[in-house]
Amino acid sequence: MATPTMATKPRATAPAARMDPHTARRGMFVLEDGRNVVFTFFLLVFLFALWGFCNGMIDVMDKHFQEELHLNLAQSAWVQFAHYLGYFLMAIPAGWLAIKLGYKGGIIAGLLMVAAGGFWFIPASHIAQFWAFLLGVCIIAAGLTFLETIANPYTTVLGPPQYAATRINLAQSINGIGLLLGPIAGGAFFYSKNAAGISTGSERLWIPYAFIAVIVVILAIVFFFAPMPDIEMEDDYHVDESTPDTRRSIWSHPHFWMAVLAQFLYVAAQAGIFSFFINYMTSQVPPIPTSWHPPHAPASGFFAGWFETHRNGALGFSNKAASNLASLGFLCFLIGRFTGSAILKKFTPYKVLGWYSAAAVALCLLIFAKLGWVSVACVFLTYFFMSIMFPTIFALGIFGLGQSAKKASSFIVMAIMGGAVLPKVMGAVADRYDLSRGFIVPTLCFGFVAFYGFMWPRLSKAEGTVTVSTSGGH
């Protein structure tokens, strides 16, 4: 989830609060009562790495199921449907239970749910039916919803307020590492072969998830005994409660309900590109020159098994190679997050959203045009330009809603259901034509997001400023 900061004073940014000398002397992880909570923060960092790793593995599963269960692209998109369905179903219950159980109770509940989903993959591998794997994906996503709902805001209160952004950015950098490692680990297990060259992916699919489940159970035990202070938080979105016009229905604000639609379409585009990345790299990439893989190339190590001869006789990337290349895409996404944070501080957020989305439209059209390696490079660049969209749409959508901001945010979070629906449309187009043509779906999605960004001043009738932190989000 994004960590937006709103300022509602006309044409001016609120002046920085004068720092209390006592607060200035406190360390980044020291509470007002003098307690040092660096160990608590250290534990939270494991949660950030965990859900980054799990999300990274999800995006390399589609191609595995296509080959093992003989599914087409539209059918394999049920993986993304199950994943986002878990987030959708638990978005509101997770917040409610977090209030009832507190930080520690909510985190432990989420960890146990993730462990249950991980252990479920053991019988699912024996059942060997698609629905069994989808159930495990959905359960894990539901548990991750708890962790994301609690861990993101909790990092902001584990010390002096002026270090809140530093703490959450530090935690999110670890999340990025998990996101990078997930596709590599997933590729190693999902696309493994025995000595005879026969795939053993289905037989070994349970191994990474069982390993995650064991680690998660250990984490739950550690959290149970670890000191975790329940710290009162200020308003999550720092919205000025004196903002006028908050008595109207939130649906009467065009900049809000169009943000819900924009978020739905953005997550749809993101999920489609992420989930079909391996398919693109193994089916749409031009023939690879033999000079890239000469006969004397080493047969072992990280690059072992990267190249294979496809049905048309051309040398291309293997599934394992494509899953490793997905990590490069996520690296572009992470770079976009860090650079985007600096850009959003210097330029108006709605303009940045508009131009980034317009760039994504142009890139998708170049992919659609099938321009060889130019199109391949464009796939990676889409990761970069998608990086700031979720938190920016989030911040623009709740701008000026005052006491209604929390209610509005729940609808924007639920809009991630777009990631469950539209990838099936993209898959259907790809099945009918090819995957390059399937990129027309994210093109249209990004087009609406660009429209929302450029039209936001008219929709919101805002005279204030919006500050966005890209420290969280999908």
Please identify what each model-predicted range represents:
Residues 2-47, 51, 67, 248:
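Cytosolic juxtamembrane N-terminal segment immediately preceding the first transmembrane helix
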Residues 39-69, 273-281:
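Extracytoplasmic
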Residues 112-127, 358-371, 454:
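C-terminal ends and interior cores of transmembrane alpha-helices
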Residues 58-62, 183, 249-327:
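Extracytoplasmic gate region of multi-pass secondary transporters
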Residues 163-191, 410-422:
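Glycine-rich segments within core transmembrane alpha-helices of 12-TM secondary carriers
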Residues 186-195, 210-240, 450-457:
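C-terminal membrane-cytosol helix-exit motif in multi-pass small-molecule transporters
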Residues 78-96, 327-339, 418:
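Central cavity-lining transmembrane alpha-helices of secondary-active solute carriers
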